[in-house]
Design a protein with these regions (language model features):
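N-terminal presequence-like segments and the immediate start of the first folded domain
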Residues: 1-65, 71-121
Length: 121
């Protein structure tokens, strides 16, 4: 199967695709929302972007298999985790996840969320 771009019409600030799909596997670039407000609002806005990209790829959050969360301050973990947990509240098997602090995130974001999904998950 050929490589398919997801969200090719989205504005980006570098040489990358918002998402790529090959053989039923979907990789999404890190999603940020630095203008959304506090950590909870940025987390929700980033997850909303992920939902839109997943839909464009023909899947939902129920098919997400791995998530990576980067925080500009690990002390924001609990606030991010509350929003993240609510997003997954109806998902039977949550994805594997890594979460850690990064020295700085693009555009001054407080959180960046990367996701992978599979059509057959």
């Amino acid at each position: 199967m050929a490589k398919e771009g997801i969200g090719a019409d989205w504005p980006v600030f570098g040489p990358y695709s918002p998402g790529v799909k090959v053989d039923g596997i979907i990789w999404l670039a890190g999603q940020i929302a630095p203008d959304a407000g506090d950590i909870a609002e940025q987390t929700q806005a980033s997850l909303d972007k992920i939902d839109v990209l997943l839909a464009a790829a023909g899947v939902t959050k129920h098919q997400v298999t791995f998530v990576q969360v980067l925080l500009d301050d690990i002390n924001n973990f609990a606030a991010m985790n509350d929003v993240y947990g609510a997003w997954l509240s109806d998902v039977e098997i949550p994805p594997a996840r890594a979460a850690f602090e990064a020295a700085a995130l693009p555009r001054g974001a407080a959180v960046e969320i990367v996701a992978q999904a599979h059509e057959d998950a």
